[in-house]
């Protein structure tokens, strides 16, 4: 082959390789990384629907023991969980052995112990589904359905960092009051024919109780993480001040991410990329209230950022609070696997997946059509933000290969 022909062939090969890279970066299937991500996506799609009323096919372990064994440093549950539907069904139906106030936090909740000694958090329904929360993006009561939807979004995104959540209808008169502590019982009252309680928390008031319809209250049940995995609380580097007229540094300093990169645990390991993943997750659900976050203790910075307390979400489907994405657009970096997953979810796939994932939840419909539409719209905003970063600094500086999978102990 003549030199000129060789040069032409080489140029053609380089051109095709460049096209393949662009194809990958826009959600294609051209590399080993993208093929792996596509296989993971197809696996998620296949397991998305959860059978109604499922039960474990064996009796060697309780549902709680099964779920406890799933937890590892980088995941709350693995990518293959054939028992997930059975565990969620147990959460939605198991007998309540004890009920107490939920002491920590600012919002109303109850701490329950289910049959077999499993602790769970019950968050009551405060709004009808189509209620729009006005005001600040973190305004309003907790939304129980937001906890449910956020868990399933965690599944869809492939993060697997959120505790298990399911909807449940609880009879306060027959299931809760007979096993309630005196402290919880003292907060029960009647509004007409409806049984209500206001619990104990920073913002809990007798004048603002949560009320059942008659005796039956809709809510969400969140599975308590195993005690062998104690949590450590961290101040979120992109947290808000919650004080009128006072901005956090990230709100006025566009170079703030460079300062964060010099602080542990963000100067090494996966934590900063976890924060960026979380900003995408929170933007999609409209959660502007992640002022702190939890990881596992004594992790040396290797633990995942656990997606706890997602109830200040899905408040206003018309509001896309871009400031939630500050970690993404200020750091201008994101995991390749996250980028590939987001591209596979565009074009209405995300909202369709959410409908499918929540179809058999006891609290279905979990989200209104307006909130499902907002998910797809916000996803487009995330993709546009990443593309802008790639145009500014190149894909090689924006898309980070980080697939840290730590083995279970």
From Swiss-Prot:
Its cofactor is Mn(2+). Mn(2+) binds at residues 142, 309. Disulfide bonds join 196-211, 201-204, 257-331, 332-389. Pfam families: Fam20C. It is an enzyme of class 2 (transferase). It is a single-pass type II membrane protein. GO terms for cellular component: Golgi apparatus; Golgi membrane. GO terms for biological process: embryonic cranial skeleton morphogenesis; proteoglycan biosynthetic process. The keyword Iron-sulfur does not apply. The chain crosses the membrane at residues 7-25. Residues 26-409 are lumenal. InterPro entries: FAM20, FAM20_C. It catalyses: 3-O-(beta-D-galactosyl-(1->3)-beta-D-galactosyl-(1->4)-beta-D-xylosyl)-L-seryl-[protein] + ATP = 3-O-(beta-D-galactosyl-(1->3)-beta-D-galactosyl-(1->4)-beta-D-2-O-phosphoxylosyl)-L-seryl-[protein] + ADP + H(+). It is found in: Golgi apparatus membrane. Keywords: ATP-binding, Disulfide bond, Glycoprotein, Golgi apparatus, Kinase, Manganese, Membrane, Metal-binding, Nucleotide-binding, Signal-anchor, Transferase, Transmembrane, Transmembrane helix. The keyword Transferase applies. Residues 1-6 are cytoplasmic. Glycans are attached at residue 193. GO terms for molecular function: ATP binding; kinase activity; metal ion binding; phosphotransferase activity, alcohol group as acceptor. Belongs to the FAM20 family. Responsible for the 2-O-phosphorylation of xylose in the glycosaminoglycan-protein linkage region of proteoglycans thereby regulating the amount of mature GAG chains. Sulfated glycosaminoglycans (GAGs), including heparan sulfate and chondroitin sulfate, are synthesized on the so-called common GAG-protein linkage region (GlcUAbeta1-3Galbeta1-3Galbeta1-4Xylbeta1-O-Ser) of core proteins, which is formed by the stepwise addition of monosaccharide residues by the respective specific glycosyltransferases. This is Glycosaminoglycan xylosylkinase. It comes from Danio rerio (Zebrafish).
């Amino acid at each position: 082959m003549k030199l000129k022909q060789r040069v032409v062939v080489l140029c053609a090969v380089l051109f095709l390789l460049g096209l393949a890279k662009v194809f990958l970066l826009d959600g294609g299937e051209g590399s080993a990384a993208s093929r792996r991500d596509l296989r993971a996506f197809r696996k998620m799609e296949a397991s998305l629907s959860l059978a109604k009323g499922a039960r474990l096919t064996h009796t060697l372990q309780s549902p709680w023991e099964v779920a406890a064994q799933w937890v590892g440093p980088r995941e709350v549950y693995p990518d293959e969980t054939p028992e997930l539907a059975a565990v969620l069904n147990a959460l939605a139906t198991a007998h309540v052995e004890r009920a107490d106030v939920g002491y920590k936090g600012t919002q109303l909740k109850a701490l329950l112990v289910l049959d077999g000694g499993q602790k769970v958090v019950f968050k009551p329904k405060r709004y009808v589904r189509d209620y729009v929360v006005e005001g600040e993006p973190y305004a309003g009561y907790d939304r129980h359905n937001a906890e449910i939807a956020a868990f399933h979004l965690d599944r869809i995104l492939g993060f697997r960092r959120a505790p298990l959540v399911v909807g449940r209808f609880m009879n306060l008169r027959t299931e809760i009051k007979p096993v309630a502590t005196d402290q919880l019982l003292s907060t029960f009252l009647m509004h007409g024919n409806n049984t209500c309680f206001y619990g104990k928390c920073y913002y809990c008031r007798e004048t603002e109780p949560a009320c059942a319809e008659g005796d039956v209250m809709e809510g969400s049940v969140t599975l308590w993480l195993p005690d062998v995995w104690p949590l450590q609380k961290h101040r979120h580097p992109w947290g808000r001040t919650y004080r009128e007229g006072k901005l956090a540094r990230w709100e006025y300093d566009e170079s703030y991410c460079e300062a964060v990169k010099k602080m542990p645990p963000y100067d090494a390991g996966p934590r900063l990329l976890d924060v960026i993943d979380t900003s995408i997750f929170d933007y999609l659900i409209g959660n502007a209230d992640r002022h702190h976050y939890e990881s596992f203790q004594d992790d040396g910075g290797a633990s995942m950022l656990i997606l706890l307390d997602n109830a200040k979400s899905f408040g206003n489907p018309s509001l896309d609070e871009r400031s939630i994405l500050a970690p993404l657009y200020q750091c201008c970096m994101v995991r390749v696997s996250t980028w590939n997953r987001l591209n596979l979810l565009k074009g209405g796939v995300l909202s369709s997946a959410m409908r499918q994932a929540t179809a058999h939840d006891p609290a279905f419909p979990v989200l209104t059509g307006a909130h499902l539409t907002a998910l797809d719209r916000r996803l487009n905003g995330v993709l546009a933000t990443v593309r802008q970063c790639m145009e500014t600094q190149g894909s090689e500086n924006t898309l980070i290969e980080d697939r840290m999978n730590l083995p279970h102990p």
